[in-house]
Design a protein with these regions (language model features):
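Short, well-ordered secondary-structure micro-motifs
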Residues: 45-46, 113, 144, 191-195, ...
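Structural beta-alpha unit
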Residues: 67-100, 105, 234-272, 309-310
Length: 310
């Protein structure tokens, strides 16, 4: 599935966090790794220094992969001139890239912030391929021999959220790791107008209000729980038929991102796979909502599947 993996780098230490993750994936899938740097036009005089750096990095990657994979992988270096957003998108579209792995934050603006006007945001909702985002601190937190040991797949019951399912299945099958399906059952709560809102529509509530809501609505409607369970069992059966080890979890809450982050901690998840289209579309899942919050406050690598990639 991942024949070509693109690693956009800005030559900062933060951006190099992707190297061990990409090495492990490439070793398992036999992928070609492409190290990609976009330089400013005015830095032509020192391009040879950029190339030297990337060549040393490529050699390190090859040596690391030899330790875990029976066959070596190809590591290619590309340097372009221009802006990262445009150059990365052009490379993806013209070179049959299957996956992008990049740091969620670096020294030159590859970052998710309060507003998503960044390279990462542009790439995530523009390119027609999955994008894996790694937080720099994550590499410092894990002491595991393998970086990918399990996978968390949040679903919201919508057709769009299930776009992540085929990718999750391919990743789990290729890495031979189990999948945990996850669904949050919405706790309804009164709005300022007296009507009731659903937690999946995601609004900010303060801690005191959240405690009141959860105490007043501590139990999920039995029929709703049965419906959710039936949905997850259907997906679980499909994955098991394809040789994937799979289980499921259901929690109740009002903040989907918070529940995803918590369950990833409880299960010590190594990868979260999500579609960038949720119940309310791209703007709801990516632009200032669930996926952004999971990335910003969570520590687990996030694999985002744009609807165009499905």
């Amino acid at each position: 599935m991942f024949d070509k993996i693109l690693l956009p780098l800005d030559l900062s230490e933060a951006s190099e966090v992707v190297i061990p993750y990409a090495s492990e994936l490439a070793g398992k899938f036999g992928s070609e790794l492409i190290l990609y740097y976009v330089r400013p036009p005015e830095r032509e005089d020192i391009e040879h220094l950029f190339m030297d750096y990337l060549e040393r990095l490529a050699e390190t990657i090859k040596q690391n992969i030899k330790k875990t994979a029976s066959n070596g992988v190809s590591v290619t270096i590309k340097i372009a001139v221009g802006t990262p957003e445009q150059s990365i998108c052009e490379l993806v579209n013209n070179n049959k890239i299957d996956l992008i792995i990049m740091a969620s934050i670096s020294s030159s603006g590859f970052k998710i912030g309060k507003t998503l006007g960044s390279v990462v945001d542009h790439i995530c909702h523009t390119v027609p391929v999955p994008v894996m985002l790694i937080r720099p601190r994550r590499a410092q937190l894990t002491g595991k021999r393998l970086l990918f040991n399990n996978l968390l797949l949040p679903l919201d019951g919508s057709t769009l959220s299930k776009l992540a399912l085929p990718v999750a299945e391919e990743v789990a099958g290729g890495l031979k790791i189990p999948v945990m399906l996850f669904k949050m059952a919405d706790l309804p709560y009164p709005s300022e107008t007296g009507s009731y809102l659903s937690g999946s529509e995601y609004v900010q509530v303060n801690e005191r209000d959240e405690q009141v809501i959860e105490s007043n609505y501590s139990a999920v409607n039995e029929a709703e729980e049965s419906r959710i369970l039936a949905e997850l069992i259907t997906v679980e059966k499909e994955l098991k038929e394809n040789g994937i080890t799979v289980d499921h979890r259901i929690t109740s809450g009002i903040d989907a991102a918070k529940e995803i982050i918590q369950i990833s901690k409880d299960l010590d998840s190594d990868l979260i796979v999500m579609s960038t289209h949720g119940r309310s579309g791209l703007n709801r899942w990516m632009m200032g909502s669930i996926a952004e919050k999971v990335l910003r406050y969570g520590e687990v690598p996030l694999l985002l599947i744009n609807a165009r990639a499905a």
